Amino acid sequence: MQRPENDIKGIAPRKLLIKRSGEKKMICKIRKWKLSDATDLAAALSNKKIQDNLRDGLPYPYTEQDGTEYISAMLSADENETFAFAITVDNKVIGSIGVFRQENIHRQTAELGYYIAEEYWGKGIMTEAVKQICEYVFAGSDIIRIYAEPFAYNTASCRVLEKAGFQYEGTLRSNAVKNGKVIDMKMYSLLK
């Protein structure tokens, strides 16, 4: 079976059993962004609950034009420094995931960031996407450590990382200011 040209080579899409009123198999995969994804991206990010778990700087509401600008930036980024992909379920874009190489003495370390649309929370999809991107980055680059720093109150994100094999390294006390509050963050990492 031939892969569509935007699929990530070497990463097999996996079927997840999603439990709703009935059981439905959904295919979760990461793929390169397309400019036509801007509408789905804007729909996912125009949600305050999602933005409350991300770093500051995103416009709210998030527009299709904002999505187009972000996707353009990701498509033009150095592919050895920025690994940024759309998360899809059954060919619909439902979120974003990226691994971003650090600099200087941390040049073989990269930070992981991600989110998915609220209606897909708690279904194992994000854990699967995290596994896929880590597999891809470790197989195709010299990166030896991928880390993530979720807000300490974001227990769902912490669970995603743990289920994806990341190890909890500690709490970064009073490490950020979000929505006017000083908050802790947690440090997780996965080694090659």
Regions found by a protein language model. Give the residues of each.
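Acyl-donor (CoA/ACP) binding surface of acyl/acetyltransferases
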Residues: 1-39, 43-49, 84-192
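Hydrophobic residues in alpha-helical segments
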Residues: 45, 54, 75-78
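Conserved GNAT-fold acetyl-CoA-binding loop/helix
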Residues: 51-73
